[in-house]
Regions:
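N-terminal accessory targeting/assembly segments
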Residues: 1-137
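Canonical P-loop GTPase G-domain recognition
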Residues: 153, 162-219
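Non-catalytic alpha-helical coupling and interface elements of nucleotide-dependent molecular machines
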Residues: 49, 89-92, 99-103, 149-152, ...
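A broadly tuned preference for mixed-charge, low-complexity surface segments
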Residues: 93-111, 141-144, 184, 207-217
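Short, glycine/charged-enriched secondary-structure capping and boundary segments
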Residues: 58-60, 109-110, 140-143, 170-173, ...
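Short beta-alpha junctions and helix-cap segments that line functional grooves
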Residues: 74-77, 143, 198
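Phosphate-binding glycine-rich loops and their immediate beta-loop-alpha structural context
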Residues: 118-185
Length: 219
């Protein structure tokens, strides 16, 4: 983590998903920067009960303190920072949560139903499913429901495309997804030229997460 007196390195921030080549372009973000002129932006990479680990470059992380109000039992969980959130830091203290561009949420257990943010500011979600015994259209649909409505772009990635006896059947089952303009790719992860089909979603300032069962080919 850089010193507070150092200029903000937006190029380094872009490598961890900062969505612009320079200063923030959203008015709501600009307003918070103006309200906290001494603060610096960072991204939450770990979430703990009383604090967070925040980064401002790929290998620069800092343990930080969350605002006192975030630790109150009745404070709404979705108003606390989550992994992927951008925050403003003054020293080791989080002084502002920058408005989320996107959010992936799920229902949280408790006396009253509420939604929990499990990842924020995600541009693309690769929903990974193997074209082998792992292939499960219903699981893909569940992931699409999880992603839907949060602003992130779902991309269905069918791995192990070298197992051609499954590929065409799988694509036929998922024709409906294509009709909904959801990108659908069948790739062979062992072939770099095949995996290169994912590059359009992996540009500077882009944040991608992968979801799928164990053994689906996410690695």
């Amino acid at each position: 983590m850089r010193r507070m007196t150092d200029p903000i390195d937006y190029r380094a921030l872009q490598t961890i998903g900062w969505p612009w080549p320079g200063a923030p372009e959203l008015p709501a973000w600009q307003a918070l920067f103006d309200a906290h002129p001494q603060a610096r932006p960072g991204r939450v990479i770990e979430q703990h009960r009383t604090g967070y680990v925040v980064a401002d470059a790929p290998e620069a992380a800092l343990k930080t303190e969350s605002p006192a109000e975030w630790q109150r039992p009745r404070f709404p969980s979705h108003e606390r920072a989550a992994v992927g959130d951008w925050v403003l830091l003054d020293g080791i203290k989080i002084v502002a949560l920058l408005p989320r561009r996107t959010a992936i949420k799920r229902g949280a257990a408790g006396e009253h139903y509420h939604q929990q943010v499990i990842a924020a500011n995600i541009d693309t979600v690769f929903i990974v499913c193997g074209l082998d015994a792992d292939f499960n259209p219903r699981r893909i649909e569940r992931y699409l429901l999880l992603v839907g409505g949060g602003g992130a772009q779902p991309v269905v990635v069918l791995t192990k495309a070298d197992q051609t006896e499954y590929s065409q059947d799988a694509l036929d089952v998922l024709e409906e997804l294509a009709a909904q303009d959801i990108p659908l790719l069948a790739i062979n992860g062992k072939d770099p030229s095949s995996a290169a089909a994912l590059l359009p979603w992996l540009g500077a300032g882009q944040t991608v997460v992968l979801v799928g069962s164990s053994g689906a080919g996410k690695s």
